[in-house]
Amino acid sequence: MKQLTSSQVRQMFLDFFKEHGHMVMPSASLIPQDDPTLLWINSGVATMKKYFDGSVVPKNHRITSSQKSIRTNDIENVGKTARHQTFFEMLGNFSVGDYFKKEVIPWAWEFLTSPKWLGLDPDKLYVTVYPKDTEAYHMWHDVVGLPEDHIVKLEDNFWDIGEGPCGPDSEIFYDRGQENNDVAEDDPENFPGGENARYLEIWNIVFSQFNHLPNGKYVDQPHKNIDTGMGLERVVSIIQDAPTNFETDLFMPIIKETEKLSDGKKYAANKEDDVAFKIIADHVRAVSFAIADGALPSNSGRGYVLRRLIRRADLNGQRLGIKGAFLYKLVPVVGEIMKSHYPEVVDQQAFIQKVIKNEEERFQVTLSSGLNLLDNIIAEAKKSDDKTVSGKDAFKLFDTYGFPYELTFEAAQDAGLKVDKKGFDEEMKAQKERARKARGNLQSMGSQDVTLMNIKDKSEFEYGTLEEKHAKLIDIVVNDKLVDKADGEHATLIFDKTPFYAERGGQVADHGEILNQNGELVARVTDVQHAPNDQNLHFVDIILPLEKGQEYILKVDQKRRRGLKHNHTATHLLHAALREVLGTHTHQAGSLVEPDYLRFDFTSLEPMTKKEIANVEKIVNEKIWEEIPVKTTVTDPDTGLKMGALALFGEKYGDTVRVVQIDDFSTEFCGGTHCENTDQIGMLKIVSESAVGAGTRRIIAVTGPEAYKYVTDRDEILKEVQDEVKATKAEDVTNKISSLEEDLRASQKEAEQLKAQINKAKAGDLFNDVKQVKGLTVIAAQADVEGMNDLRELADNWKSSDKSDVLVLAAEVNGKANMVISLNDKAIKAGLKAGDLIKTAAPIFGGGGGGRPNMAQAGGKNPAGLKDAIAKVLQEVEEKQN
């Protein structure tokens, strides 16, 4: 068998199929771009759906790829079995109506066994086929030459997920020998395709030749397809003679680096530690690539998966004796292993590390307390009759300590316990309900949904000119009912065509007027929203009666529309500038386009520096002043992506999309309204940059007249400050302020020195009144001071005065009670503790406090009780002495 690295195996696979006329397709992002049904890309074929369903015709009907994939449905098995992973690579070759069984089966055999390629021992290869698939059997036996006892017929070898394309499949297995098995040689599961560790599945070839009809019948597909998948990690484990995937060159460098970070732990020393090493190695691969592709930790969706993986890895780091954040330190190792085919981890290494480290540090704050609570919860559950961790306890771990439910479930399972999932879900539901009530009842179109869903009439939004549009009124909704005439106060209208933009994609709706054919104002448009069937709904205040079927003149508020166009184009410029300054890992996380300002949310872990903000603003304004034409193209999503358009994560695109291009600086999918040229924006001014959540920042900016107003307002403020500080010109204001600040600091220093002298004099008076309480000397008094700081300063003076063994000082400040108690070593040796004394006294003046044995302080609401509190302390001093 050849000695090959994982990189060589990957490249060899792609080269083999390239030689057989295949187009090598780069791995798609782990984040699905055009499939809202998927959380992650989880296989090679997941990226081929558009070709197999006919929605897109590929340039080459033969395709091969090595696809990054994430699956977390069996996450609890990662580390405990030889093959389970959350992140893996799927090598695949695909035929879209081109070749079929007579080509793909011999190719698979050639790649696996030819000395030019992998050179595996043919005697160790077995295949499974569907019993009725005589063609596949013939190819394996008569053409390839596999003996009958190496071909297993299995009813399960039929790929079918319900309605749609389906067909038989053929799986290829490698015999690792009985010495690597986990069942006896005579076990009924000891065969290729059975539940055993001896026969390792390395390749699955699906022959998609039938169509499963709704009536349950199967008919031949006119165009037959091939879909294959070979797990890179599995085949590499065979090539490198590794007992599991984790002993290959894809994982071992990560495990070795983890050993260095651990408390002297070594891989292969004991089973429990090995599980932890494997989990860490797998999870750091998954999160590194997911973050490189644009995902960030959060409390929902794929962000929750990332958070769960990072925290699961950190928990296993604890088991290896690793203290604090550590997973981020393994990212460079991942990048080094994968860089030959996937440079993105190396390219974005600093950002990926920062994201992981931030998430780890957040978890570390509560990790220790959470683990202690988890141990206590498990101990209590073991004593219970039903051996179950309550849903309430599981939710507390989640809500207070950041432990995902799945981590609690795994810990409980390891301890032989169950978790009350229903109870957990009920707690979660109750919390969401509390949050909903706190937000209040938001207005929605929900009450109209039934009526609106039944409206099928077509309505077209017309981009472009803002001239008046003549349109027919085709539907009127009043009080959730369809009517033929509206003459009340409010109504919702649908026209056969409209120039009014409906709110979408962060851009708010157009406003305007509706006139009758005589030019009379009949209604004011106050909002426009999308109906369930995508018509534009015009919410109007009625002036004169409106009738269904009549022609009306629709007039958009041009000033408002201009503001919206300018600000929307500005958001595209801002997005591109942010990516240029902060890096291409920066993505849009939300936006709001209003006529008088814009708001843009973007992914970033840190606040922008003043220099970065200024640089972004400069780049945007340069593009505005370059007078660049804004080009809009209507096309299909695939063509748009090839044009370089940015697709927003989570957005679903239809068969046609609008691509907005600003030269080669910005290209985005966008359905909003835009300028014809960037110079129409005038200028942009960033008003603020702030945080809106973990990993998300927000910029608020103004353009055009609003930007001019913002600058002139600030100029007026500057002039007022200039007059106030008596600067001769605006450029001198900062120097003048610095000079005034210096004078102020000098004056404050003088005042503090004078105050210290006064306090010292007060201390002299106070410290002369010394009482003898049994074997200790005591100074106890109420002082005339301005605050607790003054009391503490008096106590500091007392320490160096050697006037007494005990100091009790009290003061009333702004209607509040304050007390300080200090003890010297003699008083402490006599059995006194300042913290205990203050806790006895504080309730008397309506407060609480604490401190160290030699110094304590307290505050309260009832200064009238200070005299009695001092007396109580003196009593305690007398009684508590040894």
From Swiss-Prot:
GO biological process assignments: alanyl-tRNA aminoacylation
Alphabetical list of InterPro entries matching this protein: aa-tRNA-synth_II/BPL/LPL, Ala-tRNA-lgiase_IIc, Ala-tRNA-ligase_IIc_anticod-bd, Ala-tRNA-synth_IIc_core, Ala-tRNA-synth_IIc_N, Ala-tRNA_ligase, Ala_tRNA_ligase_euk/bac, DHHA1_dom
Keywords: Aminoacyl-tRNA synthetase, ATP-binding, Cytoplasm, Ligase, Metal-binding, Nucleotide-binding, Protein biosynthesis, RNA-binding, tRNA-binding, Zinc
Cited function: Catalyzes the attachment of alanine to tRNA(Ala) in a two-step reaction: alanine is first activated by ATP to form Ala-AMP and then transferred to the acceptor end of tRNA(Ala). Also edits incorrectly charged Ser-tRNA(Ala) and Gly-tRNA(Ala) via its editing domain.
Gene this protein is translated from: alaS
GO molecular function, one term: alanine-tRNA ligase activity
Catalytic activity: tRNA(Ala) + L-alanine + ATP = L-alanyl-tRNA(Ala) + AMP + diphosphate
Similarity section: Belongs to the class-II aminoacyl-tRNA synthetase family.
Phylogenetic lineage: Bacteria, Bacillati, Bacillota, Bacilli, Lactobacillales
Keyword Membrane: no
EC class name: ligase
Entry domain remark: Consists of three domains; the N-terminal catalytic domain, the editing domain and the C-terminal C-Ala domain. The editing domain removes incorrectly charged amino acids, while the C-Ala domain, along with tRNA(Ala), serves as a bridge to cooperatively bring together the editing and aminoacylation centers thus stimulating deacylation of misacylated tRNAs.
Primary localization class, coarse: cytoplasm
Cofactor: Zn(2+)
EC number, as in UniProt: 6.1.1.7
Native species: Lactobacillus gasseri (strain ATCC 33323 / DSM 20243 / BCRC 14619 / CIP 102991 / JCM 1131 / KCTC 3163 / NCIMB 11718 / NCTC 13722 / AM63)
PROSITE patterns: AA_TRNA_LIGASE_II_ALA
Binding site for Zn(2+): 568, 572, 670, 674
Subcellular location(s) of the protein: Cytoplasm
GO cellular component: cytosol
Protein name in the entry: Alanine--tRNA ligase
Cofactor note (record): Binds 1 zinc ion per subunit.
